Amino acid sequence: MTRWALVVFMVLMLDRVPGTPIPTFQLLPQNYPETTPSSVSSESPSDTTTGPSASWSNSKASPYLDTRVILSLDVPIGLLRILLEQARNKAARNQAATNAQILARVGRR
């Protein structure tokens, strides 16, 4: 299990995913109000002029999408760091046990 975590960690470190979202993720909220004509046609004429443009600007100004993408990248890396630390601690304990066995054998001679 720890070897798998180390391999995943190395792959993530070598193939860094950009911190900014992919442009297609940015296009979805912007195009959403324009692609639903039923919601636009049900509004009053004054709302139709300001409705889609206002919702488009609000969705673009919202940092929610950027935060969600960054968190989804940070959480696995944080978990992998914890797994890496646990693997290092286990390896250090195993090495200490091996060293103790070697010293015990040398001391018996």
From Swiss-Prot:
GO terms for biological process: adenylate cyclase-activating G protein-coupled receptor signaling pathway; cellular response to glucocorticoid stimulus; cellular response to hypoxia; cellular response to nutrient levels; digestion; hormone-mediated signaling pathway; negative regulation of follicle-stimulating hormone secretion; negative regulation of gene expression. GO terms for molecular function: corticotropin-releasing hormone receptor 2 binding; corticotropin-releasing hormone receptor binding; G protein-coupled receptor binding; hormone activity; hormone binding. The modification Valine amide is found at V106. The keyword Glycoprotein applies. Disulfide bonds: none annotated. It holds the Pfam family CRF. Its main location: secreted. GO terms for cellular component: extracellular space. Residues 51-60 have a biased composition (Polar residues). Residues 24-60 are annotated as: Disordered. Residues 23-67 form a propeptide. InterPro entries: CRF (IPR000187), Urocortin_II/III (IPR024270). Residues 33-50 have a biased composition (Low complexity). Residues 1-22 form the signal peptide. Keywords: Amidation, Glycoprotein, Hormone, Secreted, Signal. Glycosylated. The keyword Secreted applies. It is found in: Secreted. Binds with high affinity to CRF receptors 2-alpha and 2-beta. PANTHER family: UROCORTIN-2, UROCORTIN-2 AND 3. Belongs to the sauvagine/corticotropin-releasing factor/urotensin I family. Suppresses food intake, delays gastric emptying and decreases heat-induced edema. Might represent an endogenous ligand for maintaining homeostasis after stress. This is Urocortin-2. The lineage of its organism: Eukaryota, Metazoa, Chordata, Craniata, Vertebrata.
